[in-house]
A protein has these predicted regions:
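Alpha-helix initiation/capping motif
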Residues: 2, 38-42, 115, 202
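Selective for proline/serine-rich intrinsically disordered segments
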Residues: 7-8, 42, 79, 136
Length: 230
């Protein structure tokens, strides 16, 4: 971001962006040019935050959304389809549990809830259709801890990625990617925001997957775009 030496970065209050010419516009819509198109899928102010969160978590890329649930749904809807399965911990934030129980079931995705403090229970729940392992650690609301390395290694042995909700700890106290997780999600409304004055979410992970979450998960499924004000 070019800030002209400003100590505080500018807030880009634009819905759309101009192209130098038609050819550049075509390249951007085709994903061949990294410039901006529409603030619903990318904004310079939001991109600055995304870069910093990716750096803090030690990930390749990040996607910021309008809320934590926006991050979770945009990410998961990009990773599974009808007939797939998810193995999730039995202790989850209530709204996340609601998405798993109602939203995903309506799309033909099966979610198996197990005690993830017991790796054997996770192993028993994994099938050839399992596409994702999901947990919170510490979990909401009972603060239960999960051995992330053990679960991540178990998933890796079956070719299944682990997604961890790191809302409670933030990267200041815990970096799940360093323990083998593939994805990290946050409700940035809480400890990352810190002051109770914003709503935001984030997902961090491999650049290719984050791009799909941006252009499919947010752009086509949830519309959970983050405001540049937040």
């Amino acid at each position: 971001m070019q800030c002209e030496g400003a100590l505080a970065p500018p807030v880009y209050l634009t819905s759309t962006f101009a192209f130098e010419n038609t050819e550049v516009g075509m390249q951007r819509f085709a994903g061949e040019n990294p410039g901006y198109i529409y603030s619903r899928v990318g904004n310079p102010t939001v991109a600055l935050l995304e870069g910093r969160l990716a750096s803090l978590e030690g990930g390749e890329a990040a996607l910021c959304t309008s809320s934590g649930m926006g991050a979770i749904t945009s990410a998961i809807y990009s990773l599974v389809q009808a007939g797939d399965e998810i193995v999730a911990d039995q202790t989850l934030y209530g709204c996340t549990f609601g998405v798993f129980r109602h939203g995903l079931s309506g799309l033909g995705v099966t979610v198996r809830h197990v005690d993830m403090t017991c790796p054997d229970a996770v192993a028993a729940a994994i099938t050839p259709r399992t596409k994702l392992l999901y947990c919170e650690s510490p979990a909401n609301p009972n603060m239960r801890l999960i051995d992330l390395r053990a679960i991540a290694d178990l998933g890796a042995a079956h070719g299944v990625p682990l997604m961890v909700d790191n809302t409670y700890c933030t990267p200041y106290l815990q970096r799940p990617l360093e323990h083998g997780a593939t994805y990290v999600v946050h409700s940035a409304t809480k400890y990352l925001g810190g002051h109770g004055d914003l709503l935001a979410g984030a997902v961090i992970g491999p650049a290719e997957a984050i791009s799909r979450m941006r252009f499919f998960g947010v752009k086509e499924m949830t519309g959970a775009s983050m405001s540049a004000f937040n």
